[in-house]
Amino acid sequence: MLSAASPARADWRDDIGTFRIGIVAEPGGGNTVPGLARLTDAYTNALGMKVEFVVARDYAALIEAQASGRVQYAAYSALAYATASERCGCVEPLVAPIDADGAAGIRSVLVTRDGKVPDLAAMASHRIAIAPADNVAGFLLPLTGLAGEGVKIAEDSPFLAHAPSATAAETMLGDGEADGLFGWEPVGADGQSTDTGGTVMRLEAAGIPKTSLRVLWTSAQLRYGPHAVRSDLDAEAKRRLAVFLTNLKSLTPDVYDLLESRHSGGFELAVAKDYMTALAVVRWQSAGKE
């Protein structure tokens, strides 16, 4: 029985030949991957087959590589994964990192000071500071989320005060140049704020009493970007990768740190519905370009 089953188990490895993992180059890093030999060995042992890392110049190139099948596995930002999903419908998230404090992602918040904006319905009659257009929590999430809730808001809404940076938007609230601002907060997998960072804490650190600050609205959670595989990858390969990645932090933390330097809490399983917020942003962006 065992000898008959072994060739079948090996079929997916034979079909793939070399398992290719795509990552985006670090700024100024060229094609170098810190700890490449250790990472390659770790994935090779997990899959029981030859593994190669492919370094893409940017997420657009990485998306194209996975959509075309040149790589089977890719490490994405949330919006890059959503873009890949829209591009080909051929990818699925496997795992995503969390922070040491349990945060699994972020959400946008609308913050007011001293009750200047009484509620969300009054927003349009006040001055609201908003971050630049490439800022996810300070621009993309509020415009996408509020529009999805039926609130009249657009990039050129007259009540929006466009700040040159997220920090500048915070300063505008602190100096009284704005009655509210769109910021962010970290959120756990349960959808609750972890109270371990974000705009309110930054404003408090800048000298604004926390008791004077109020959150009027929160967006849906944007989960941290996933490691995603092609949907047509063999189920056994997906299982092996999931077991390897979800145990990586506890078993070989040094390898985990090489693979994920921004979020130190380990990997947890992820599913497509975790990225509905990211998909909404990508679709909103696409609609604006048409």
Describe each model-derived feature in a short phrase.
Residues L2-R9:
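C-terminal segment of classical bacterial N-terminal signal peptides
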Residues A10-A82:
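Extracytoplasmic small-molecule ligand-binding "clamshell" domains
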Residues W12-R38, V229-E290:
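An extracytoplasmic/periplasmic, membrane-proximal ligand-sensing/linker region
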Residues Q72-Y73, P93, D179-G180:
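Short, Asp-centered acidic motifs that coordinate Mg2+ and/or phosphate
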Residues C90-A103, S212-T218:
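A structural signal for short loop-to-beta-strand junctions that line the ligand-binding cleft
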Residues V111-P132:
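Flexible hinge/capping segments at coil-to-helix
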Residues R127-D234:
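Pocket-lining segment of extracytoplasmic ligand-binding domains
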